[in-house]
Amino acid sequence: MIIALILTAAALLIGLRVRKNINNKPMEQTDTTVIAKRVLNLIILDESGSMRGLERASVDGVNETIQTIKGGYEQFPEQEQLLTFITFSSRGDSDYRTQFNLLPIPKVEEFNYANYFPNGGTPLYDTMGKALTDLEKEATDSDIVLVTIITDGYENASREYDQASIKALISRLDEKNWVFTYIGANQDAILEAGKIGIRNAMNYRSDERGTRDMWKKERKSRQYFMRVARSGVSMDRLKEDYFVDEEDK
């Protein structure tokens, strides 16, 4: 009887220290645990010439992702969701086009096909540098920031930022509540993401079907992320395994 009581007490103590998430993986409740009142979603989408022919799949994917974020907000309105959406290419007049800027998700309207016309090169580093530094000015220490980068080619047109400076910037932001994901085609996305310090990466095939499949997986991953972010996990755990297997979602 005494042994049984001791074992029961020990089990209760362990239960206070470790909690299981929806995948039954232990999540330490430490000082880094965050249940954010606000999530800043930053989506950076390649608009260079190599995206030509994929306009419809890309725009549809953006709009479906907007609906995913809206659905999460409608289910949990106490967690504010804001969206910044940027497209980029070296078109001459403007490399960097802000389609939505920190809009509360209920106010975000459908992205119009007329606002996406691929052309020019791929100034990825300049776009990331400007977008991240601008968003850092708006983010608070209690916010979670989810950065999604989608490109179908290599960096080839930046003038202000290089690989080293972007890696240093991401490394600094990674010490905060920032989560980075990189989705790439026509490259080894995992290798390219690693060069700038991004741990979550996914390859996709740059044709109509591959683009639609990519957006579908991104939305499922985002739904999972939003669900886990509300459960009070540690930030270290939240930064890992964004693109988890389908059966885990």
Regions found by a protein language model. Name each.
Residues M1-I2:
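N-terminal Sec-pathway targeting helices
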Residues L5-K249:
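Acidic, low-complexity intrinsically disordered regions
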